[in-house]
Amino acid sequence: MKFVDEVSIHVKAGDGGNGLMSFRREKFIEKGGPNGGDGGDGGSIYLEADVNLNTLVDYRYTRRFDAQRGENGGSKDCTGAKGDDLVLPVPVGTTVIDANTQEIIGDLTEPGQRLMVAQGGWHGLGNTRFKSSTNRAPRQTTPGKPGEARDLKLELKVLADVGLLGLPNAGKSTFIRAVSAAKPKVADYPFTTLVPNLGVVSVGRYKSFVVADIPGLIEGAAEGAGLGIRFLKHLARTRILLHLVDMAPLDESDPADAAEVIVRELGRFSPALTERERWLVLNKMDQILDPAERDARKQAVIERLGWEGPVYVISALERDGTEALSQDIMRYLDERTLRLEEDPQYAEELAELDQRIEDEARARLQALDDARALRRSGLKNAGAADDDDFDDEEDDGDGPEIFYVP
């Protein structure tokens, strides 16, 4: 199934039913009085988190959803039936945004959680409601109120405990295959991974955590180059990041340079995301046969990054060191959960960090969307509205060229 993590939809709640003007008419009963009933309320629209879904592809082509209208009132004081509510299932981890105001309406992070996104219209009143001591035969009614209509943007962020960072071919997919039952595609060319992959890692008999593998980052990713920028947002809700570095690249490039690229692009995308707990994982060390060279490369990466956090040396292909790493991750997650329960200040600091990451990620992606809209309309920037040839060659010297992948 195709992975879709952003869609725009239009929702329209049902209108309320109209009130009825009616009078009682029976044999031998003169001037029976009003008996027009009220209309029914319009149906509302809800989004519900469904644990069985992992993509928004169902909303890629069907984008308009209307709830049922309330029925009109009937005679004999009969109230019209209420319109049926419409419940739209979405994956757990979906953020709902008002497309016009960019206001966050809600976040569906728990299975079964339900969020109203469009309120059904209020019912109209029948003429019975307007009877009084001075007006015994009212001819006044009210129509039903229109249902709420909204343009929504749905954003899916996968819910994972651990996120994998690295250049293409750093071994992220091989790592997730080594520690879980997930089987993402693995090949010896860049961008083998095109969409996020999730794997459940079992530690012992009763404990487990979820790992998210996103497409590799490249130089200029924060400005839109490559694939990774679209999926960096999925790391916003992870609890720990694993920075994988290919220590034996086929092109014989410097692993320290590759590590710097990831740190730099991560900071450009979201400075707050760099404050997330991050561990350095040096992969493919089994391909370096000389122990002295192995230690030298390891030390070069650590010194170049000024790294002071945990460092792990592994071979994802041979599964060497992966079990110890998984156990340490599980231990960290357990300790983190316990500290969140016991230390309110720590919990508050993490909540603030999470919010900053969400805000920065959304602002960066919105800026890229705006830039793409300008380019599609034939504008290279806001000050060059008269450029009709849509040629961006003069920009090539100022930074990376931006490629958009559908």
Curated annotation (Swiss-Prot):
What's the domain of life for this entry?
Bacteria
Q: What class of enzyme is it?
A: hydrolase
Reported EC number(s) for this entry are 3.6.5.-
Cofactor dependence: Mg(2+)
Predominant localisation class: cytoplasm
BP GO terms, sorted: ribosome biogenesis
Give the molecular function GO annotations: GTP binding; GTPase activity; magnesium ion binding
Q: Which residues form the Obg domain?
A: 1-159
Q: Which GO terms describe its cellular component?
A: cytoplasm
Residue ranges occupied by any OBG-type G domain in the UniProt entry: 160-334
Sorted alphabetically, which CDD domains does this protein's record hold? Answer: Obg (cd01898)
Positions of Mg(2+) binding: S173, T193
Record-linked PANTHER family: DEVELOPMENTALLY REGULATED GTP-BINDING PROTEIN-RELATED (PTHR11702), MITOCHONDRIAL RIBOSOME-ASSOCIATED GTPASE 2 (PTHR11702:SF31)
**What does this protein's UniProt record list under function?**
An essential GTPase which binds GTP, GDP and possibly (p)ppGpp with moderate affinity, with high nucleotide exchange rates and a fairly low GTP hydrolysis rate. Plays a role in control of the cell cycle, stress response, ribosome biogenesis and in those bacteria that undergo differentiation, in morphogenesis control.
Under the subunit heading, UniProt states: Monomer.
Q: What is this protein called?
A: GTPase Obg
Q: Which organism's genome codes for this protein?
A: Pseudomonas paraeruginosa (strain DSM 24068 / PA7)
